[in-house]
Amino acid sequence: MSEKTFHKAQTIRAKASGVPSIVEAVQFHGVRITKNDALVKEVSELYRSKNLDELVHNSHLAARHLQEVGLMDNAVALIDTSPSSNEGYVVNFLVREPKSFTAGVKAGVSTNGDADVSLNAGKQSVGGRGEAINTQYTYTVKGDHCFNISAIKPFLGWQKYSNVSATLYRSLAHMPWNQSDVDENAAVLAYNGQLWNQKLLHQVKLNAIWRTLRATRDAAFSVREQAGHTLKFSLENAVAVDTRDRPILASRGILARFAQEYAGVFGDASFVKNTLDLQAAAPLPLGFILAASFQAKHLKGLGDREVHILDRCYLGGQQDVRGFGLNTIGVKADNSCLGGGASLAGVVHLYRPLIPPNMLFAHAFLASGSVASVHSKNLVQQLQDTQRVSAGFGLAFVFKSIFRLELNYTYPLKYVLGDSLLGGFHIGAGVNFL
C-alpha cells in the first residue's frame, strides 16, 4: 500500500480556482487537552467551502485563528484528496498545544525609561477552550513594584475575535513630576470585541481602584492637600478602526480611536474624560516611511468635586512630547506638576529601515504639545498660547509587536519658562508611542 502524501495548502492554491470541493472530514493531529466542542466551533465553516480555492483560504484562516485565540501554539493546515470521491477532500490540522505551565524572567526598560525585572508565570488553555491565567511581578531599579493576576476567556467561533477578562493588580510607584508616591489596588473587568463585520474594534472596561496618594515633604501644597485615600469606580468605552500593518511602528495604514471614561456613580472620583487618538503611516520613495500621530484629551469634573490630581491630563516624556520631563508639561506649583483638564499633542516622524529592516530604523521627528489647566476659562486659547515644540533624530528598535525602544538626540525648540527640559540623548521604551 503506497504511503499517503500530504501537500501544503499554498502549493495548490494557484490551481484551485473553479475546482469544486466537498469536505468529507476535518482531522486534528496532536490534540491532547483541547475540547472537541471548541474545535468544532473553530472549523465548522470549512464544510461550507464551495470550491478548492475557498477551502484552501478558509483552512489557513482557521489555522491562524486557532493560534490567535490561544487554543494552539502552532497549527498547519494540510489538505488531502479523499479516496472515495473525486471532489472530496480531507483537511488535516497538525497542531501543537500550549504548554501546561510557563514561567520566566526577563529584564527590560519600563515606560518611564527605568530598567526593570519581571517574573511571570501562566497556564494556557486551562479548560481546553483557550482560557488563560497569567501572573506577573515587576520591580524597577527606582523601587516601583507591580503585581497582577489576570484571567481571559475567548469566545470561540469562526473568525470570532472577542473575549472577556478579569484582572487584579497592586502597584506602588513614585511620581517624580509631582513629588509623590501612589499605591493602587484595582479590579478590572473588560470585554474586547468587534462590530460591523469586524471593521470596528470595541472595548468596554469596568474599573474599581482604591488609591493612596502619599506626598513627599518636597511636594507642593496643591499636591499635599489631595494626599490620602480615594476610591474610583469608572466605566470606559472605546471604539477604533485600525488598518495598520502592525501596531508598533506601522509602515502603512491608519488608526482612529475614541475613548470615553465616566466616573461618579460610586467613590470619590467624578468626571468624564474623552480621548481621541489618530495615527497614519505611508511608504515613501527610497524606502522611507512618513508617519504622524495626534492625541487630544478633555476632562470635565462633575458636580462640585474637583478632579483629582491622579485623573488629570499629562504630557511630556519620551513617548509623546520628547525633550521634556515625564508628565511635566502644564500648570506647576513650586516643583510639582499638577496636570490639566485638556491636552493636545502631535508628532510627525520620518523613518528609514536599516538592518535588520523590520527591526531597526533611523528616526527623525518633530513633536508639539500643550496642556490647559483644569480651571481654565478658555481651553482653546490656553492650548494655543502654551505650545511646546521639540525636534530630534536617532534610532528606533522594534521587537515584533511586543515593545519599541528609541534612542534619540532631542532638542526643545519652544518652551515655557519653568519647563523641565531634557535635551541631548535619551532612551524611551514601551508600546504606546505618539
From Swiss-Prot:
Major localization class: mitochondrion
Pfam families recorded: Omp85
Localisation per UniProt entry: Mitochondrion outer membrane
InterPro entries tied to this protein: Bac_surfAg_D15, D15-like
Domain remark text: Its C-terminal part seems to contain many membrane-spanning sided beta-sheets, that have the potential to adopt a transmembrane beta-barrel type structure.
Oligomeric and partner information: Associates with the mitochondrial contact site and cristae organizing system (MICOS) complex (also known as MINOS or MitOS complex).
Name of this chain's protein: SAM50-like protein gop-3
